Structure formats: C-alpha cells, structure tokens
C-alpha cells in the first residue's frame, strides 16, 4: 500500500477520464464518463460545465474503485484538457453564468470577422501567434459578456472569473482557492502575448475584456495548489501538472528536441512541431503557440489544426452507416481494388490549417460506375493522410527544417493501412508510440516531475518506446500524382462553396 502513483485527468470534448500511472509510465487504472453535447443552433457547440465537473468526480472515484488504489497514494495530479473551450462563472457561488462554449463552436464568427474587417489580423498574429478565428477563447468571452445580462458590469467589478477547462477544474478541485492556468492553455486564448508572457493589455482593451476575469499564468510543471479534502476522498494531493491536450501529447511523445513533430489522430488531427526556445511566426497560416514550460524555460511550438480526422470515420459509421466500427475501415481499405482515384474532402465544418476556410463544405471527386463501398471508405481514410501532408509541407516551408520522422498517436493511429499510406504520402518514417495514451501520459510526466516522482526528462526518455515504425514504399511519381489530385480536389471544393455564396 506504500506504492505511489500519478493521476492524470484527461478532459476531452466528448468524455473525461481519470488515469492512474505507475513509475514505469504504465496505466494501472482508468475511469471514463461521457457527457452531453449541446447544439442550441446550427454551428453552435456547448457543454454544461457542471456536468463536466461531475464527470470528473465520477471518473476519479471509478479509477480508485477499479484498482483498489487509495487517494493518499497519489503523489500528484496532472490536468490536460480540450483547449479554447470557455467558461465564465460567479466567483462567490461557483455557478457558471452560461454554458461552456466549445472550441468547435462557430457562434462567435461575427466577432472574429469584425476584428478582421477592422484590420487587426497582423497585430493579433504578431502578439499571440494565432490567426483571428472563432476557434479561440477571446471571441467566446466577448460573446458571453455581450449576451448574459449584467455580465460586463459584473466582470468589471471582479465578481466573475474566466477559465478554460484546466482552470475550471483546478478551481473546483481546490475548493475555489486557486484561479490559475498554464502557458500552453493561455497561448490558445488569443489574449496572451507569447513574447512578454503576459495577458496583452492592448487586445484586452480592444475587446473590452476586464483583466480581473483572467487567471494567473504559470508553467506546466509546478505545484498550483492542493485538492480540497472533501473533493478528493479525504486527501489533500498536489495539483502539479497542467497542459492543453495537444501540448500534453507532444510532451507525452517526448518530442523534446527542436524540429520533432507529432500528430494526434483524434476527432481532428493536430500536428505540432517543437521549435525550441524561440517562436516561429508562420507566414502560411499555421499557429505559433507555447509547447511547454519547465523550470522557467519556455519551449515554443508550431501547430496545424485539422478539424475533421477521426470524426470522418465516425461519419462513415453513424451517418452513412457503411461501416459498423472505425477499425473496420482498415479491412475495407485493404480490400479496395481501385487505383486511389477517389478523393473525399471532409470539410464538414470548413477547412482548418493551412486553408482556414470556414465556408468550405465536404465533397467527393472521382466517382465512377465501378466505385465500390470499399473504395469510398479507403478514400475517406486517405483524407486523414492528405490533410496531414498539407500541414507538414507548410511546416517545412515555415521553418526550413526537413522533417525526417512523424510521431503519431490517437485512436486512428492503430490503423496500419492509414500509417503506411501516411508514410508513403510524406516520404517519411512514421513512428507509432508504444504507449498510445500520450495525452494523459504527457501531463502525468509534467505532474510527476514537479513532485519528484520522476527525477528529470532523461529518466522519462528511458520509458519511451516505439510501437511500430512504417517506412515509405511508394514511388515518387505515384506519390506526387496522388497528392496533386488531392490539391485539385481541395481547390474545387473551395471554389464550389464560394461560387454558391457569390450567386446568393
């Protein structure tokens, strides 16, 4: 009973998990609970912040019940989270004044467009590393303050608090004593100056957001506070790690060297490159962000966000009903006999990096009378790889770094067909992590370092294993022919929607 463990709270877009890791980085227990998605209007996505909180408590309890591990055996807690999702709550009662507005939600697009029309794109990009988009927290805060009666005045009086999910959960777990976020989450708000490492007063003034709303910003591996005993089954345990989900996955992949790149195939795909101690401002619509900070040292990152990745396979299963499970897509792709002439562009919610075209919609090209169900499934699966190449090509252009290896994780990373096609299309090695729990593991590592559970990153590197390595097998001519077809399909998709808009 004297063994110690680290707990990672992994709060995602559709479910939350509490995972307990041992000293070797092995998962020894897990609790998971889904929560409801709210869609008040087309394009809007919201969560109930209290449902998320209750789901966290439930998963913590389930992880202890299933394993027999006691709360007092937890040496530290790390929190990783869906980024950008925005909550504002009453400082005294702890009650949210509106639902959490989720990162996917487009309900604040008009606020973002107004900033673009007024000419603030360059200023905000230079200060925050981000493009102006409804994706980020800033416009979501402004929307809530505009649409909840009295919210602006209460915010100015210091009666309200803002937080992304990490901040909300830390505030709740500590019994309302700690209002804090970390550099990785702060850098996704569109309010944080990544050069000064402070909330940017000019942007706050531009959006009329009171600074009193905002949390203190700290590193990713330090003790932020202790759990209130009544929220952690009688134990006060340090919360000692915090990171947005994609930065946590970067750390979980131990992508600690400059130029190392990982891709998480989740609901979307998130390709992140460690750029070291200096930010690289993209000239090609990638996002400059903070990767992680340990012992006062900042590591920056370059990111390309693809909105639809694994969710394209969910679309095949739930909406099209042509597969029964996502893993079935691998068998179908292998049984397809066509020559890759079908292209699916899954722009269901627009196109992310490097296009950032919110008006684009999904399209299919290259159908013939002989096209089969398996061909269609294969083309959908291949779209994940094509979108990833779009981002990696752009990263190489922005940084001048030739990327030799892509490290991958996430649910779709179990698909061998996808990873072989990805390697072929990139003409690069693709390495699947031995432990695919890289998001939770990353924040567990950060939490463990802060409390001495692990000594340093050298000790962590000894725990990292590659599950399988894929090498390119496709000829250069075939590779470039296929990719040229994809680029044509994307261009046609964008033209189609924009021509419709012009004719309205």
Swiss-Prot record:
Broad enzyme group: transferase
InterPro entries registered for this protein in UniProt: ATPase_NBD (IPR043129), Carb_kinase_FGGY (IPR000577), Carb_kinase_FGGY_CS (IPR018483), FGGY_C (IPR018485), FGGY_N (IPR018484), Glycerol_kin (IPR005999)
Catalytic activity reported: glycerol + ATP = sn-glycerol 3-phosphate + ADP + H(+)
Annotated metabolic or biological route of this protein: Polyol metabolism; glycerol degradation via glycerol kinase pathway; sn-glycerol 3-phosphate from glycerol: step 1/1
SUPFAM superfamilies xref list: Actin-like ATPase domain
Gene Ontology molecular function: any one: ATP binding
The record's account of how the chain is modified after translation: The phosphoenolpyruvate-dependent sugar phosphotransferase system (PTS), including enzyme I, and histidine-containing protein (HPr) are required for the phosphorylation, which leads to the activation of the enzyme.
Enzyme Commission number(s) of this protein: 2.7.1.30
Residues given in the record as glycerol binding sites: 83-84, 135, 245-246
A Pfam family of this chain: FGGY_C
Keywords: ATP-binding, Glycerol metabolism, Kinase, Nucleotide-binding, Phosphoprotein, Transferase
Modification sites for Phosphohistidine: 231
Activity regulation behaviour: Activated by phosphorylation and inhibited by fructose 1,6-bisphosphate (FBP).
Binding residue positions for sn-glycerol 3-phosphate: 13, 83-84, 135, 245
GO biological process: glycerol catabolic process; glycerol metabolic process; glycerol-3-phosphate metabolic process
Residues that, per the record, bind ATP: 13-15, 267, 310, 314, 411
GO CC annotation, single: cytosol
Assembly, per entry: Homotetramer and homodimer (in equilibrium).
Full protein name: Glycerol kinase
Gene responsible for this protein: glpK
